[in-house]
Amino acid sequence: MATNTYVALDKITVGSAVASVTFSSIPSGYTDLVIIGNLGTTSGSANIAMQVGNGSIDTGSNYSFTNVNGDGSSAASSRASNQAQIYIDYSAYPTTTLTSTYIWQVQNYSNATTYKTVLGRSNTASRGTNATVGLWRSTSAINTIKLDTQSTTFLSGSTFSLYGISNAGDATPKATGGVYLTTNTAGAGAGTNVFATSVTDILDYSNVNKNK
């Protein structure tokens, strides 16, 4: 049976304009995290930045990122290292209406032995699309995430939904019964077809012989 891989963990809805939103006490029982934002800002000309941490937000110069963006007629790219945050949109800012969509994926967030990678995508109808890959240079597990407008505020009604991504495991269908055709390879019946009536018959050669 299929299992849900996206598990809703939290949702923040901005009631009145705020400069940032923070998810804290994020549980560790998932593989990745995904945040989906539907948002706008009061200025329409500010980057959206991400900072993460363990117990508290890391504000040090421990982030780097590479960004590409395009609007259908031109494209650009940029990269920066030793930053205090990861910019997700860099140049195609959100608008002053609730029409900008952002998706952040934080990979292996609870792993305590590797640096953490963030994949970001944003889409603003009048300003194009962005894709970003960022890095937090820390082996600490992540349990708090902050999204910041840098110099303005998120509009009232902006939403941020946090999901945990779990490993769905092996969903490959497996046989549990039925009729199978096999071929004897030894003894007096070598080369003859044998009908086995169950998986047990296939796995147990003595049962297959009984059905000759």
What label would you give each PLM region?
Residues 2-212:
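Surface-exposed molecular-recognition determinants
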